[in-house]
Regions:
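Positively charged n-region of N-terminal signal peptides that target proteins for export
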Residues: 1-6
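Bacterial N-terminal signal peptides
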Residues: 7-16
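Boundary at the C-terminal end of the N-terminal hydrophobic targeting segment
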Residues: 18-23
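Beta-strand-enriched cores of mature, soluble protein domains
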Residues: 25-245
Length: 245
């Protein structure tokens, strides 16, 4: 999807709005697992700058942080999620900034300082700015694994169940560095979701047999600063008209 920080264009825009204030923000680092699902067939074509399986792609990304710090604030054992939907008949990358909505969910276990930290990280790592219709909510974010099936819930708002696929030569299929990759999606394992539900932002999702992804992550603020700077340079280069003799 649905990063979906979920996409390269998102970080181009993030880099464009980053200013002096961002330089003063505390450094951070987080490690853990990404759980993700969406309405597309597996594997989600949005990561390859192709149109979604359905007219639009609706999906989520949930980060379960095992270890993390934002300045002096510990983020161990907390979670953050993002749910988005793209407009019909456009790729996620083409339509970035015009998505139907982008809602951020903060773990209710977090205290005030942790919630602020999670919000700042979420707005950097996840595609929060993909839409003009945004909200930040606090909710319980949980997961469990039963018989190889991962079950993730964002309070009363939504849930999904997914299981990794088996590769033709054994093991689990892995996707490495797709066109839409960001540091969070440099490599991920491919699965299929038994169900994806969502009841917020005026939605009533109930998808079955769609895309599911799982990834380990280890991210830092310095990594994203470097990544965003590189994307900004690429963006500038594409806007520079060719010289003629």
């Amino acid at each position: 999807m649905k990063s979906f920080s979920i996409l390269t264009v998102s970080l181009l825009l993030v880099a464009g709005v980053a200013g002096a204030a961002d330089a003063k923000k505390p450094s951070w680092k987080i490690s853990g697992q990404l759980e993700e699902s969406c309405s597309c067939n597996a594997a989600c074509p949005c990561w390859f700058d192709s149109k979604p399986t359905m007219p639009g792609c609706g999906g989520n990304q949930v980060l379960f942080i095992k270890h993390g710090r934002y300045g002096d604030v510990s983020l161990d054992g907390l979670a953050i999620g993002n749910v988005v939907e793209s407009p019909e008949n456009q790729t996620m990358m083409q339509s970035y900034g015009k998505w139907n909505f982008s809602y951020l969910y903060i773990d209710e276990k977090a205290n005030a300082a942790q919630r602020e930290a999670l919000e700042q990280i979420g707005k950097t790592v996840l595609p929060f700015s993909g839409s003009k219709k945004t909200k930040v909510r606090v909710a319980p974010i949980t997961r469990e694994t039963v018989g190889g099936e991962h079950r993730v819930a964002i309070g009363k708002y939504g849930s999904f169940r997914g299981k990794l696929l088996e590769g033709g030569l054994g093991g689990t299929p892995k996707l490495l560095n797709p066109p839409g990759a960001d540091p969070l999606h440099a490599e991920y394992q491919q699965g299929r979701a038994a169900s994806v539900t969502y009841r917020d932002a005026g939605q009533n999702w109930n998808f079955k047999g769609t895309n599911y992804m799982l990834a380990d992550f280890s991210l830092t603020s310095a990594q994203y600063e470097k990544y965003n700077a590189g994307l900004a340079q690429k963006k500038t280069a594409t806007k520079t008209p060719p010289k003629h003799d």
